[in-house]
Regions:
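Class II aminoacyl-tRNA synthetase-like tRNA-binding/catalytic domains
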Residues: 2-251
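Generic detection of long, well-ordered alpha-helical segments
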Residues: 58, 65, 84, 131-138, ...
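A generic alpha-helix surface/boundary motif
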Residues: 142, 323, 414-415
Length: 480
């Protein structure tokens, strides 16, 4: 029976209760000289050192102290004799809770590539890098809920299975119970989805926005935070097939209110992560600096991770229209010298990441909010401006990443919305429930979408989006 209560490594590392008996349970990170055990229990990125007195333990037991083994250690908390931490545990007793075969365990104490760790995503949590990344991810998720809760928003759970395409992109995963080998057919030979589970064609959701708009017309302020899915065959470092989205919708807000809310949210959650994950962010900053050393000088970032985060906290976001941005880009040196991969030569072009990053990193040197985009490159639900060619859209651009938030004031005028849906060949009968909000007490409202993994990517400094979600889903990738 345990007589000593287990302590977390994080608490012990901050303790000065020297001479007290403590118990630590965790996993062996390293064991050297048959004496020094580095133990981590997941409560912190840092290990605690446990010291076994020479010749005090059975050789057979010592041989089982391998990297990855789960252990329980009881001993005296003492002032550390070495550098790096102020305390260590002088071991009086230890036991092996779970063995780890040293020859088979893939995470030996050496540097592993991120590509290799992606292949063993079920074990990569045990590395310092991913311990840090997912602690930051947790902190950001908590901060998002706290931000909206403190402002009186209602957290809305929107459906994962839907019959609508909120973005009109058509890149959706179909949900069906029909027999693939012998699906029922209509008289015209098409698959008869009326005989399917839901009695119609259904898909995994691409966005909870439309449903959030319905709730905003009753609660005033709502937000969603859940998984979304895109069957986009993009095998890049910036795309996932399954990712998480934060989507607030606020009744009576206009585009300016929307920009203010998004800027406040981003600054709040970044500050929370910096305040609560200081050790993790410091580790990730140093990891990034080491990685940068292998790059040519002109490819290295001008800002380290902490400076980049402060760059967003300490600057008011620059606000300008798409039209103003196009003029800046057309007259920019990289555009004139054809250094851009995509040359800007006309109004109406869809901006690429290189253009967005130029505006943020080179021209304004602060985060940027672009507004009033051409209606032809934006979704049907965005409110049309009086000029007939632009809509009240907004994108927030960050250094190193480009677009991190996309949103708009929504079109609350029924006739305008119906006309735009017709122009874009979106069947009104399939979205009758959405149009009903414009028939019964319609009101101005606005909202935006924040891709959670893009946010985590930015705050951690990681460069591949598959490294900021526990088990990434992408083309030909659905392990674990």
């Amino acid at each position: 029976m345990e007589t000593v209560k287990r302590s977390k490594v994080k608490d012990l590392l901050q303790s000065s209760a020297y001479g007290t008996e403590v118990m630590v349970k965790g996993w062996v990170r390293t064991f050297r000289n048959n004496q020094f055990i580095a133990v981590n229990d997941g409560s912190t990125i840092n290990n605690i050192q446990a010291v076994i007195a020479l010749n005090s333990a059975d050789d057979a037991l010592l041989k089982r102290l391998t990297t990855g083994a789960a252990v329980s250690i009881v001993g005296e908390l003492i002032e550390s004799q070495g550098k790096g931490q102020k305390v260590e545990v002088k071991v009086s007793h230890f036991e092996i809770l779970g063995d780890s075969d040293a020859e088979k365990f893939p995470l030996q104490p050496k540097k592993h590539s991120l590509e290799f760790l992606r292949e063993i995503a079920h074990l990569r949590f045990r590395t310092n890098t991913f311990n840090a990344v997912f602690k930051v991810r947790h902190a950001l998720a908590y901060a998002i809920h706290k931000f909206f809760n403190d402002k009186g928003f209602v957290y809305l759970h929107t459906p994962i299975i839907t019959a609508s395409d909120a973005e009109g992109a058509g890149e959706m995963f179909r949900v069906t119970c029909l027999d693939f080998d012998n699906p029922p057919r209509t008289e015209s030979g098409e698959v008869d989805f009326k005989q399917d589970f839901f009695g119609k064609s259904t898909n995994l959701t691409v966005s909870g926005q439309l449903e959030a708009e319905l709730a905003a017309m009753a609660f005033g302020e709502v937000y969603t935070f859940g998984p979304t899915f895109r069957a986009e065959n993009s095998n890049t470092t910036r795309h996932l097939a399954e990712f998480w989205m934060i989507e607030p919708e606020v009744a009576f807000n206009d585009l300016t209110d929307n920009m203010n809310l998004a800027e406040d949210l981003l600054k709040y959650v970044i500050k929370h992560a910096m305040d609560t994950c200081a050790d993790e962010i410091e580790f990730l900053k140093n990891r990034l600096l080491e990685e940068e050393k292998s790059k040519p000088q002109d490819e290295r970032s001008e800002l380290d991770l902490t400076a980049k985060l402060n760059f967003c906290l300490n600057n008011d976001f620059e606000r300008l229209t798409y039209t103003e941005a196009i003029e800046i880009l057309k007259n920019s040196t990289p555009n004139k010298k054809k250094k851009f991969k995509y040359i800007i030569d006309n109004w109406g072009a869809d901006l690429q990441s290189e253009h967005e990053r130029f505006l943020v990193e080179k021209h304004f040197k602060k985060p940027v909010i672009l507004t009033d985009y051409p209606k032809d490159i934006k979704a049907f639900y965005m409110r049309q401006n009086d000029d007939g060619t632009t809509v009240r859209a907004m994108d927030i651009l960050f250094p190193g990443i480009g677009e991190i938030v996309g949103g708009s004031q929504r079109e609350e005028r029924l006739e305008r919305l119906e006309k735009r849906m017709s122009e874009m060949h979106i069947p009104a009968e399939e979205l009758y429930w959405y149009l009903d909000t414009r028939k019964f007490g319609t009101a101005p409202h606005a909202g935006f979408g924040l891709g959670f993994e893009r946010l985590v990517l930015f705050v951690t400094g990681m460069t591949n989006i598959r490294d900021v979600i526990p088990f990434p889903r992408a083309p030909k990738t659905a392990e674990f």
